[in-house]
Amino acid sequence: MKFQNYKPIIINFLHKLIKFIPIAGIIIFIYLLIDIGIEKIIEAFLSIPIIFLFIAIFLMIIRVILSSLKWWTISIKQKIDISLFKIFKILLICFFYESITPASIGSFIGIYYIKKESKISWQKSFTNSLLDNAIDFIILMLLGLIGSLLIFNYYPEIFYMLFLIFMIIIILFLFLMKEKRGNWLFNFLIKPLFPLKIRDKIDKSVELLYEDLPTFQDIILPFFIGLSVWIIFGLQVYTIAYAFSVNIPIISFIFIYYISLIAGLLPISVGGLGVREGVLVFLLLIFGVPPATTFVISLCSHIIGNIFPGFIGGLLLIRKTYSIGKNNL
């Protein structure tokens, strides 16, 4: 039986699988609620002093501004004509889509808005968004790797797993940053999959992907801005933890939290919900932190750090949708 006969069955199966996978995170989240106890979680939420919430919100604002600056710096290096303020608004919209999609894949909605606002090609916009997200992911993996060293005596397998993923990502990044190697990959693996009549168009698309691509020297500044973004995010989360008088050194807590963020990127949960909380509860048991406290720290940090800016991004989308005659952000 030919592949074409199986194709509808395979596509139907994949559609069902894609719909089901994000539910896994929700199931984990509900299980944690029941296992820990809803009353304990509510009690922990209500015990957070308001001043610590305001400090966390302030750090979130600084983080979003710096994230915008990082993305804008990359855009400038790519000769993309767009203002920092527009990047800021696009980033808020990305936060909205991140919070409602598995593996934060919604952040790539920025491809559409960058193209629309700067009138560049889809390929160049794709590279811009991919590079911004790749820098973020590499930094997060590096910080998570450091965190895994802090708990190596308890869970050495976490270090080995993160190290393997980190090395694969770095090798891919270094490989694809060079146009010749990127062309070779497309010609060897991807181009043969397409009909002969459209292969010339594919060649042109690959060329546009590398149009004005920043050099390694160009991404040093965005890298360090991105590093400061993740450090501030860690401080934001620790602010909530400090409100509970969690007896963990700040460095240890922040770097261990990064591991839970990496786990939250698995495509089995919407916005990392459930997976992130479950992993952090598991890891902080080493330090004797009550599960209800850890659950609230993680969830509250997610609400302030992602849901809140995502809510503002959602309002921007509504304003754009219902504003007559306004095509731009």
Kindly label every feature range from the protein language model.
Residues 1-92, 150, 156-265, 298, ...:
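Predominantly cytoplasmic-facing regulatory/coupling regions of multi-pass membrane proteins
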Residues 105-116, 270-285:
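Re-entrant/interfacial helical elements at transmembrane boundaries that shape
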Residues 93, 97-101, 126-148, 296-311:
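Membrane-embedded alpha-helical segments of transport systems
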Residues 84-87, 106-108, 119-133, 290-300:
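Membrane-interface alpha-helices at helix entry/exit sites of multi-pass transporters
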Residues 88-119, 202:
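Extended non-transmembrane interhelical loops and adjacent amphipathic helices
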Residues 94-103, 258-273, 277:
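Transmembrane alpha-helix interface/packing and boundary motifs in multi-pass membrane proteins
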